[in-house]
Amino acid sequence: MKAALIFLLLLIFSLTLYPQRDVEALVDYMVGSFSSEEQAEKDSGYFNIELEMVKIWKDRRDGPWIYIEQAVVESKDNPYRQRVYQIKQRSDGKIESIVYSIPEPLRFAGDYKKEFPLLRLTPDSLLIREGCEVVLYRADDGYFEGRTIDKNCSSDLRGASYATSEVMIDKDKMITWDRGFDENGNQVWGATEGGYIFKKKLNRFQKR
C-alpha cells in the first residue's frame, strides 16, 4: 500500500513538470536569429526579413520574457516591430504569449546584441496589447502552434479594425502570419498567400 502511494505521488509530480517543460522547449525554439531570405528568393511577394529574439530579465519569476526585433534586411538598424513577450503557462495546459509594446522603441534598437537587453526598461513601463495574446499548444510531433483569439486584437494600421496572428514554432523554423482586417472582414495588410517562413540561424549573441 505504501509503495503504491509513493508511486502515485511520483506520478502526479512528474505530470506537473510536463507543462513547464513545454514552456522551456517553446522558449528554446523561439530564442535566436531568424531569416525569411530563402522564402523571399523564391517568392517576390515576401520581403527578406530578419527576426531577432532574446531572453530578458532572466532573474524574474513571472516569465520567461523575450524581446523581439523585426526588420527588413536592408534596414536592420531601423526595425519596424519591437515587442516584448511574456510566456505563461495556463491552467488548461496551453501556453500564452502576452504581447507588450515598448514606449519609444527605437531607443532600444539593436539591444538584442547586448549581454543584458532592455536593462534600462522594466515591465511596469510596458504597454500591454490587450486581446493580442497568442494561445499555443504543443502538437504530437513536438512543434507548437497557436493564434490570437477571434477579433480581440485591435489594430488601426492602414484602416484595419482588428488584427490576427497565427504561428507555428519548431526547433529550426518559425512560421508567422500576421494580418489586419477592416470592420467588414476585408484584409487590408499582411501577407495574403500564407505566413512568413523564418529559418533559424546560428545565434552568436544569445547564451543558453
Q: Where are each of the predicted segments found?
A:
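Calycin-type beta-barrel ligand-binding domains and close structural analogs
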Residues: 25, 31, 37, 48, ...
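Bacterial Sec-dependent N-terminal signal peptides
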Residues: 1-21
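Short, solvent-exposed loop/hinge segments that bridge or flank secondary-structure elements
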Residues: 23-25, 36-61
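N-terminal glycine/threonine-rich, aromatic-flanked beta-hairpin/loop signature
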Residues: 51-79
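Generic secondary-structure boundary signal with a strong preference for alpha-helix termini
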Residues: 14, 44, 183-184
